[in-house]
Amino acid sequence: EYCNSFLSFCPTVAVILNVEEDHLDFFRDLADIQHSFRRFAELVPPAGPVIVNADNAGAMEAVAGLEPPIFTFGLDHTADCTAANLTEVDGRPVFDVMIRGEKYARVELHVYGHHNVLNALAAASAAWALGLPGHAVETGLASFTGAGRRFEHKGTYHGAEVYDDYA
């Protein structure tokens, strides 16, 4: 979204993870950021969904009253796509992806953190919106091991675990 680069896309589905005060060297304030995300969501054709994090007030405010179908995901609020039976195995999230109260997929992530559960729910929401079966989501998310330099385990040094996380 930096410098409004995402406004040059032609999305058939839009996913908005969060809208917060970021890149303030370019954007004036949160309202300016929300305006850009709304413009991005408006690029989606009428039949295409706009998938939004219901747990992020900035994202929800950005799409309030928008015409394309809004499909929500989240953990802390009632949303179209949620996680049920959330547990951890070796510190990594395992949960059922629920779409409007129905189990869609059972997900075992290989990345850590609450934010990655939300990212997985966003990906599952997009997959569902595009008509993909739940087993494709299970396979795809199980194979994801993270983005480079985002909490990337590099090894052990004198008994201490070493991670690279540029953000």
Language-model features: where?
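Acidic, Mg2+-coordinating active-site environments of NTP-dependent enzymes
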Residues: 7-162
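Switch II (G3) loop of P-loop NTPases
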Residues: 1-2, 162-167
